[in-house]
Amino acid sequence: MDNLNNITLNITEIFFSLQGEAKEVGLPTVFVRLTGCPLRCNYCDTAYAFKGNNPLTISHILNEVSKYNTQYICVTGGEPIAQSNCLKLLDSLIEAGYKVSMETSGSIDISPVNSKVSIVMDIKTPSSTEEKQNRYENLSVLQSKDQLKFVIASRSDFDWSCDLLKKNQVKSEVLFSPVYESLEPFQLADWILEKKINAVSYTHLPLPTKA
């Protein structure tokens, strides 16, 4: 058995807040933000997580999250699985009895992720400038417990996303999110109704992000 005192990950922050998006919106959640990301999306709101040097052992992380009265843990980034030890962290959180979700850019193979983890995966739209990094093979890995997210800045992004959904059978829930200050939420909602697609439109709740 691995010694969790010897396995480290580079962590940007661990904080307690309400989940501001996706299925668990509004639920008290501990967020574990891992450092580093291979992408540079032009609308990224967590660029502060690109770099840093704060190695923590998995034992330390488990101890930190246990201080909060919640069963919900969200592992995020950056890009969490850019760090290979993230898989062991996810396994350890599941073994500890938590309900775990992981937010990923979709640019790295998600098939090794523990099957009990709920995956929230982006597909990068053209306006992100990182469309070429999409790993489309991941679409077939997603299950009904998971979520596929499109961040939309324009009508062309939306039409591109709808075309991709037509070409792929996706088992997961589909989410559309407007880029802040680029697209009004009501406009995105109108497009979804116009296309009559089975998707959820949401915006981030204005919630605190630090404990």
Residue ranges and their predicted role:
Residues 85-166, 170-172:
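Radical SAM/AdoMet-radical enzyme domain recognition
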Residues 186-189:
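Catalytic cores of alpha/beta
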Residues 153-157, 179-184:
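Short Gly/Pro-enriched loop/turn and capping motifs at secondary-structure junctions
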Residues 100, 199-201:
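Hydrophobic beta-strand scaffold residues
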Residues 9, 28-29, 39-117:
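Conserved Radical SAM active-site core
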Residues 203-209:
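Conserved small/polar residues in nucleotide/adenosyl-binding loops
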Residues 7-40:
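N-terminal pre-triad scaffold of radical SAM enzymes
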Residues 175-177:
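C-terminal folded domains that constitute the principal catalytic or ligand-binding module
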